[in-house]
Design a protein with these regions (language model features):
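Negatively charged, low-complexity tracts enriched in Asp/Glu with abundant Ser/Thr
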Residues: 2-52
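Intrinsic disorder/low-complexity detector
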Residues: 7, 11-14, 19, 64, ...
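Well-ordered, non-membrane alpha-helical segments in soluble/globular domains
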Residues: 29-31, 195-200, 269-276
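Short, compact, well-ordered microdomains
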Residues: 82-110, 267-301
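An N-terminal amphipathic alpha-helical segment
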Residues: 215-255
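Short, structured secondary-structure boundary patches
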Residues: 233-239, 299-310
Length: 310
């Protein structure tokens, strides 16, 4: 896996459309299809962020059928630029160059600055408030599943009802962006495929085989067991780990997986358990399980280095 340009054959970007669909690590061909497809009601725009996401670094395009394409890209504090283009394929080529970070990708286009307005003056929170919220955000960053938007909401809400003054939205955004970039810099030194990525491969294989496999699913075991059946029709079985399990793995412990069938049979649960263990071993992970349908499957040892997405 290579960070920065292309990942496993896909562009190192996440594309989100007005239609509510999100596409992660799309190919250049798929990105072209997405650009060509916008323009209708409820589907006018597409926003691309890098993987991992970087604060105020993105590219976006807006289009209404019959009109030009409005293409914009932001370079963090270095500027925000836009241009009007007539051809969807030209837009797709530019976005692909942006995604690959090709030198000179933006050449040949007349870019105009986009006015960002005055910069907001954001006061610093108290030291106690900052330290308390930082501890919470760092813990969630180690888990690795939250987006910057989710983390910002968590930071804003964390002190509500406490004796300390809660962070404002702007304070929360600034704190999260700073800690996010620290984690991005840390993970840039990681080499090769990490254990969470091996886990994802195993879960993808299980899901493709008819076993509903979900990562970081619900808050706890009880909620997971109550909700997993609604995730997919016609599944042969399920496996998941919950958010508390993620936190435990990120703290250096093993990861408990919960599994079973939908017919209430111990034989089905045991059979699904064996399939889960086989998929994990095929991916290169180790497990502890005695074969009992009453016991969870524990993935360990586990080095929890989950790369951020955004």
């Amino acid at each position: 896996m290579v960070e920065g340009m292309e990942i496993d054959g896909g562009l190192a970007v996440q594309a989100e459309g007005e239609n509510g669909q999100t596409h992660t690590r799309v190919s250049a061909e798929r990105l072209r299809e997405l650009v060509r497809g916008i323009g209708g009601a409820g589907d006018h725009w597409l926003v691309l962020q890098r993987i991992p996401d970087l604060p105020d670094v993105f590219a976006q395009v807006w289009h209404e059928t019959g009109g030009d394409y409005r293409l914009e890209h932001r370079l963090g504090d270095e500027g925000f630029f836009g241009a009007d283009l007539a051809d969807a394929d030209r837009v797709a080529d530019l976005l692909t160059g942006w995604a690959r970070q090709e030198p000179g990708w933006d050449m040949g286009v007349t870019w105009e600055p986009v006015d960002l307005g005055p910069r907001e003056d954001v006061p610093e929170p108290s030291d106690d408030a900052r330290r308390t919220v930082e501890e919470c955000v760092r813990r969630r960053l180690r888990c690795g599943y939250d987006t910057r938007a989710v983390l910002t909401q968590i930071a804003e809400d964390h002190l509500v009802g406490s004796a300390m003054e809660p962070l404002s939205r702007a304070q929360a955004e600034r704190l999260v962006d700073r800690l996010w970039l620290e984690r991005v810099a840390e993970q840039a030194a990681w080499e090769g495929v990490t254990d969470p990525e091996l886990l994802t491969r195993a879960f993808e294989a299980l899901d493709a085989s008819g076993i509903t496999a979900r990562e970081n699913f619900t808050c706890c075991r009880g909620c997971g067991l109550a909700e997993i059946g609604a995730e997919r029709e016609g599944a042969r079985g399920f496996v998941f780990f919950h958010q508390q399990g993620t936190e435990s793995a990120a703290a250096g412990h093993g990861l408990a997986l919960y599994y079973g069938g939908f017919d209430g049979s111990e034989d089905t649960t045991t059979a699904v358990g064996h399939e889960v263990v086989a998929a994990l071993h095929a991916a290169g992970l180790s497990t502890e399980w005695d074969g009992s349908p009453a016991r969870s499957i524990v993935v360990e040892p586990l080095d929890w280095r989950k790369r951020l997405v955004g």
